[in-house]
């Protein structure tokens, strides 16, 4: 609902003040409510001012220290000071233009001393400087500056494209570093695993051979004790032949073996046969001697 008034009286709504004149001269500030005026005494309501907070967006184009053209968007929130409403009513005809002019002046004095990166980092300082300057100037005209926000900093499109490319290149470089470190760690862990596997495999082979050696020793001793007249070498030869045939049998039973290299010459077969025959004859001879 707006303010309504006539020559004899008027109603001033909440968050507003009226400027009352007498014979064309300022007399007093009228608070919200219903007021009566005496036109015969030259009293009348000259105008009404709102004390609500108003917002003004200002766009400023300027250049940074590193020769980059940017556009800054400032949002200024201001209001009329109730106690100084007469100054706001009489002193300034267009407060928005006055505010814009001072914002332009301050921003264009500060930004050329900053690089683009510094401007992004210190935009709060720029807003603070604008606020301090406006408070000093506009306070004399009955206006209070509530807040100033540096809403946006918009570089030239070509500069933005270059900044995005630089950012992308830096991220790719960082990603390659992380990837290299990950591959390095993976290779180190793989090498450690292989070394550990070889170590454990060696330990297993050593234990296996130790067990075989212990078993052969025990077999030789048992055979020598039970069969008189046999030497340890003869028992060892017999065991080796037995293991030879066991190995051939295992190779033949395995489905995964495709090629087996065996001694195939007549001499090798004869040697094996002689060893078996001699072993059996010696065993039989020792048995007869024991019977006699």
UniProtKB/Swiss-Prot annotation:
Keywords: Cell membrane, Lipoprotein, Membrane, Myristate. Its main location: membrane. InterPro entries: Band7/mec-2_domain, Band_7, Band_7/SPFH_dom_sf. It holds the Pfam family Band_7. It comes from the Eukaryota. Gene3D superfamilies: Band 7 domain (3.30.479.30). A lipid is attached at residue 2 (N-myristoyl glycine). It is a lipid-anchor. It is found in: Cell membrane. SUPFAM superfamilies: Band 7/SPFH domain. GO terms for cellular component: Golgi apparatus; plant-type vacuole; plasma membrane; plasmodesma; plastid; vacuole. Self-interacts and forms heteromers. Interacts with NB-LRR class of R proteins before R proteins (e.g. RPS2 or RPM1) are activated by the effectors. This is Hypersensitive-induced response protein 4. It comes from Arabidopsis thaliana (Mouse-ear cress).
